[in-house]
Amino acid sequence: MIEEKLMSEFPCDKPVLVTCGLPYANGSAHIGHLRTYIPADMFVRTLRMMGQETVFVCGSDAHGTPIIVNAEEQKISPRQLVDKYHVQFDSIFKKCGVIFDRYGNTDDPTNHARTKSIVSELQKNGYVYPKEIKVAYCPQCQRGLPDRYVEGVCPYCSSIARGDECDIGCQRHLEPGEILDPKCKVCGSKAEVRTQEHFFFKLSEFGDFLQEYLNTLHATPNAVNYAMEWAKELKDWCITRNLEWGVKYPGHEDLVVYVWVDAPIGYIAFTEEYAKAAGKNWEDLWKGDSRIIHFIGGDIIYHHCIFWPAMLKGAGYTLPWGVVASGMIKVNDKKFSKSRGYIVWVEDDYLAHGFHPDLLRYYILSYTSHTKDINFSWTEFQTKINKELVGSYGNFVNRVLTFIDSKGIDVKGTIDPKISSAIKTAIDMVKTEIGNYEFKKICDSIITLSDVGNTYFQSHEPWKLIKENPAACENVLFNCIQIVKALAILSEPTVPEKAKEIWGMLGYDPATLASARIDDALVPYENRPRPKPSILFTKLEDKKIAEMTKIMDERVKAAEAKLNGKKAEEELEPQLPPITIDDFAKMELRVGKVIASEKIKGSKKLLKNLIDLGEDKPRQIVSGIAEVYTPEEMVGKTVIVIANLKPTKIMGVESNGMILAADSNGATLLTVEKPSEPGTKVR
């Protein structure tokens, strides 16, 4: 069913709006950000090349507790912090060829006004109600502790969690007051629990709607499958926070709207700002018959496939037509991590060292399918670029244009049926796979076309043919330059600056390439004055890659030293109060043996395990260790289980216990030194 939905064709007669998940204005841009924005930019460029009316908007996410905490640490205002990173992101995107029709800011007046309007509409339609809830409060700091101001224990899976999300364990969204054993993140003190009135959105009333909606959503399978699981157990959603920074809740100046309400509303506000500047009507996209497509990271599927469509439905806006969720990025086969040094900063680690943005665009787009994880290492980057862009694509363009220039040939002729067929195959691949969000297949088709060109050039040996049969040689070169023209057009969405260089070397105005249409790749090249060709790509040398690898290695070592120092401090100061032997005796620890294990659909972290505890039948226990252990590795392992933990549901799957693991550089299962029978008590 998903495959049928993804085969929907472009262009269509409806306007298309493409958005990207908003970068959080709390730190600099890294390549993990580009995993979303570069594919979205390629998608937009391709649609336009196919004649599709398309608008492309994004902006900085300016609200939420992390920004307030960071601003306090730097002794500046939240707006000053946001402005600093807003400018950085805007600059990085432009340098990398990600060109939005509008790049806005959720703290700007348009978003404040649109957010208040939508919240008021939800209230008017009966989807919002007040409720007194228990919230964390720090008596030491004398402040409320919303969201990431507080840390504690997840009530569902017992993992360490932050106030609004169990990001380490079961990945659930947590409502204010749900977290157990809350502690202030600012001073480390134990938090008090106080009662306060907040406002809730009736998300629980949208269950049937969401189930039906998700079945019609033109989304990547990872987005739909993940959201389907969550749609089965909806709870009403607290949409206010007691903060000073943010969009004020209508009629209650002491509260602000939760950041995950006003952030996606930014998509609408940015469209309004674009439309005003362009003399268009924003309602054609947000209240008319349009196709709205969100490009997001895999970590914010819940918000875009559950919260957001329910809000839009409740307020009477057009629903998203598609959600495109990317895989993550690993660095050196390690989980992307700032604290552990496995990170690549776009400006400091890439652009500042002279690497062309198009190389990174190509690597991200061509490495693997969009929903799968990318691994970035400097050696893999070097190998892929040198083999494909330098060795095939760039080599073909250079040898053809250099040969023609050196011989002073006027290229004229007719297109060889084999060449027109190869070009048409590449065109058809673009037209088919863009609707499937299969950007790698499109990149592969471009390299295949350049390989066809290299083979054609080499097999016809124009350096000999020019002496033996000049007319035949001219026709061969005409077909070669036709492929070069096709490559420039078809690769513009992937490597826009390099494609423009080719376009200029063909004698066209580089600025006109963006207005070329995909079928122009088959329009015969008309001979024209051409400038002297220049080298398109240069080989990435071992010395340069070794230099970049050294920078990465040193960063990882420094991060490890810092983490080890922090661990030592934590060991000197126990974080939890001492317990009595009676407290410990309340836990029933038993030896278990894993007899079956499988991944939970829609989750990257969770495994569903069947554990033999010496009982009549095995226990089903959910564990958050899928990033460290595969299901195959789990089967047969002896583990330690808390057997009397209250049953709970995690992503709709019942869990009857907890498998114990040590958390150091990834979870490590606890086991016994000598063989023990399943069910043996641990004392």
UniProtKB/Swiss-Prot annotation:
Localization in the cell: Cytoplasm
Coiled coil segments of this chain: none
Positions of ATP binding: K338
Superkingdom field: Archaea
Cofactor binding mode and count: Binds 1 zinc ion per subunit.
Record text on subunit structure and interactions: Homodimer.
GO CC aspect terms: aminoacyl-tRNA synthetase multienzyme complex; cytosol
Full protein name: Methionine--tRNA ligase
EC number: 6.1.1.10
Sequence motif 'KMSKS' region, residues: 335-339
Residue ranges of the motif 'HIGH' region: 23-33
